[in-house]
Design a protein with these regions (language model features):
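Sec-dependent N-terminal signal peptides of Gram-positive bacterial secreted proteins and lipoproteins
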Residues: 5-22
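Aromatic-lined carbohydrate-recognition surfaces of secreted/lumenal glycan-active proteins
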Residues: 62-63, 189-191, 221-249, 288-298, ...
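Alpha-helical scaffolding within the catalytic cores
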Residues: 43, 70-79, 110-114, 172-174, ...
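Loop/turn elements at helix/coil->beta-strand transitions in domains of secreted/extracellular proteins
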Residues: 54-58, 85-88, 122-127, 181-187, ...
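Substrate-binding cleft of secreted/luminal carbohydrate-active enzymes
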Residues: 54, 58-64, 291-362
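Glycoside hydrolase catalytic-domain groove-lining segments
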Residues: 248-300, 338-339, 343-356
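N-terminal module-boundary/linker segments of secreted carbohydrate-active enzymes
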Residues: 22-107, 308-309, 350-362
Length: 362
C-alpha cells in the first residue's frame, strides 16, 4: 500500500513538472489590417503586451503641433529640458481645419513628416491626428455644426461636399504613404472626440443622443478606413478610436472591432482620479490609452505626478498617454520630472533594444 501510494505521488509529481515545464503559448495581438507591414505588426503586438509588465509599461507622449502652423520639435525640447528625457510618442496634426483656403485640400499639410521620420529612426513612435476642415463649406469651419442631410452629402462621393472630403483624404494618404515608404508605423487617430458637440463630424448638442448621427459617423470612419487601407494600400497604420472623457456615448460611436486597434480617451481634467470612461473603453477588449490629456484649468498649477499615480491605481491597462502642448504641457506644469522618471513610464530610447523591440511579457 505504501509503495503504491509513493508511486502515485511520483506520477503526480512528474505530470505536474511536465505541465510547469511546458512553455507558455505566445498570444499575438495583430492589427485590424490583415496586410499590415511586419514592423507595424510587431509594434502593435508589443504595445498590446505592455500591461503585463511590472515597470516600463506606459509610453509617454507629447503633441508637437499642427503641421506648417505650430508643429516643431520645440515641445520635445521643452520636455527634455524639464525632465532630461524625451517622449516616446510624438504627435502631429495634418489638418488645419480652421483655415480659409482656395481649395479645402490646401488645409492639409504633411511637412512634419521629415521630423516624424527622424523621430522614428531615433527610437520614438509618431502619432497623427486630423482636425479636418468642414467639407460642407469651401474650406475652414471645422467647428461649424452640420445637419445630418449635409453629413450624407459629405459621404456621397458624387457631390461637391463628397469631392472636398475625398480631396483632403487623398492628400492625407499621400503624406502617410511617405511615412510608409520609410518603414514608419503610425498611430493614426482620425475623427476624435466625436461624442462632443464641437467638431463637425460629431454631435451637435451637449450630451443629446442622435442615433442617425452616430450611424453617419460610423460610415465616415469606415469610409476613411477603407480608403486608406484598401484603395491606397497603406499597411503601416495603427487605428485609434478616441472619444471625449467628459461627454456621454463614449462607445456608441465605436465603428467595430474590425476597424480599431487601440481605444482611448481624450481627457482634460483637474482630478486625475475621476476620469470618466475607462471601464467602458477597456470593456471593448482593445489596448487602452489616454490619447490626449491635459489639465482642465491650464494655469501651470496642475501636477502631472498625480496623473501617473492615478494610472497605476485606477487605470492600470493604460499603454500610453499623449499630453497636449502649450499651456497644457507637462513642461509648464508641475510634476513633469516625476511623470517621466516614474518606474511605469517608458520614454524615447526605451522602446528598442538594438534592432529588436524590448522583450514582451506574456
Amino acid at each position: 500500500m505504501f509503495k503504491k501510494h509513493t508511486i502515485s505521488l511520483l506520477i503526480l509529481f512528474l505530470l505536474a513538472s511536465a505541465v510547469l515545464a511546458k512553455p507558455i503559448e505566445a498570444h499575438t495581438v495583430s492589427p485590424v489590417n490583415p496586410n499590415a507591414q511586419q514592423t507595424t505588426k510587431a509594434v502593435m503586438n508589443w504595445l498590446a503586451h505592455l500591461p503585463n509588465r511590472t515597470e516600463n509599461r506606459v509610453l509617454s507622449g507629447a503633441f508637437g503641433g499642427y503641421s506648417h502652423d505650430t508643429f516643431s520639435m520645440a515641445e520635445a525640447d521643452r520636455i527634455r529640458s524639464a525632465t532630461g528625457l524625451s517622449p516616446a510618442i510624438y504627435g502631429c496634426d495634418y489638418a488645419r481645419g480652421w483655415l480659409e483656403t482656395a481649395n479645402i485640400e490646401d488645409s492639409i499639410d504633411v511637412s512634419c513628416n521629415g521630423d516624424l521620420i527622424s523621430y522614428w529612426k531615433n527610437g520614438g513612435i509618431p502619432q497623427i491626428s486630423l482636425h479636418l476642415a468642414n467639407p460642407a463649406f469651401q474650406s475652414g469651419h471645422f467647428k461649424t455644426p452640420i445637419t445630418n442631410d449635409q453629413y450624407k452629402k459629405i459621404l456621397d462621393s458624387s457631390t461637391a461636399e463628397g469631392k472636398r472630403l475625398n480631396a483632403m483624404l487623398s492628400k492625407i494618404a499621400d503624406g502617410l504613404q511617405e511615412l510608409e515608404n520609410q518603414g514608419v508605423p503610425v498611430l493614426f487617430r482620425p475623427l476624435h472626440e466625436m461624442n462632443g458637440e464641437w467638431f463637425w463630424w460629431g454631435l451637435t448638442s451637449y450630451n443629446q443622443k442622435d442615433n442617425e448621427r452616430i450611424s453617419l459617423y460610423k460610415q465616415l470612419y469606415k469610409k476613411i478606413y477603407h480608403y486608406m487601407t484598401d484603395t491606397r494600400g497603406l499597411d503601416h497604420l495603427i487605428w485609434v478610436y478616441s472619444p471625449d472623457a467628459n461627454r456621454d456615448f463614449k462607445t456608441d460611436f465605436y465603428p467595430g472591432a474590425s476597424y480599431v486597434d487601440i481605444v482611448g480617451l481624450d481627457a482634460y481634467f483637474q482630478d486625475a482620479y475621476s476620469i470618466n470612461g475607462y471601464d467602458q473603453l477597456t470593456a471593448l477588449n482593445k489596448p487602452f490609452a489616454f490619447t490626449e490629456v491635459g489639465p482642465q484649468t491650464a494655469n501651470g498649477s496642475f501636477d502631472y505626478s498625480l496623473f501617473i499615480n492615478a494610472i497605476k491605481q485606477k487605470y492600470p491597462k493604460t499603454i500610453y498617454f499623449l499630453a497636449w502642448n502649450d499651456e497644457w504641457s507637462p513642461a509648464v506644469n508641475k510634476g513633469a520630472s516625476a511623470l517621466y522618471h516614474d518606474s511605469w513610464t517608458l520614454n524615447k530610447g526605451e522602446i528598442w533594444n538594438g534592432d529588436s523591440l524590448t522583450p514582451i511579457v506574456e
